């Protein structure tokens, strides 16, 4: 191969250098701004071996089955952060058993958080008086639909909440929320 003398090699002019620098800066800023937008459309990865989202307590800590069962009595329904950050009731079914389903606490009428009323043994919406039985089935309107369900699983003492895709056992129909 022959080498070209240095005088024959074209150099990068000041204008070309500034154009390259400007293009690189604008591209970097555009990619930085588009990353969160693109990331929004990518579904979150499943956590844990059983899949789903790790249930979080009111402080944002992951819920463990042993810790939850030691501080909650049988029949208790208490809120955790579930799918998409929605408040979800975990149900204690026995001394050492968390229920296989959770109940989304968002009212199907106007989206209020529905508290559990242990005295009446039902969920009662404070906004417009809708009532749901212990399984989240609507028993009194104006709410048109039952509360959404979520699968609850325990894997290595960690509690996970995942999308409910089975038939709604309360109505025998396909879930309205999936």
Curated annotation (Swiss-Prot):
Its EC number is 7.1.1.6. Its cofactor is [2Fe-2S] cluster. PROSITE patterns: RIESKE (PS51296), TAT (PS51318). The chain crosses the membrane at residues 20-42. One of its GO terms (molecular function) is monooxygenase activity. GO terms for biological process: photosynthesis. Residues 65-161 form the Rieske domain. SUPFAM superfamilies: ISP domain (SSF50022). It is an enzyme of class 7 (translocase). It is found in: Cellular thylakoid membrane. HAMAP family: Cytb6_f_Rieske. Component of the cytochrome b6-f complex, which mediates electron transfer between photosystem II (PSII) and photosystem I (PSI), cyclic electron flow around PSI, and state transitions. The 4 large subunits of the cytochrome b6-f complex are cytochrome b6, subunit IV (17 kDa polypeptide, PetD), cytochrome f and the Rieske protein, while the 4 small subunits are PetG, PetL, PetM and PetN. The complex functions as a dimer. Belongs to the Rieske iron-sulfur protein family. This is Cytochrome b6-f complex iron-sulfur subunit.
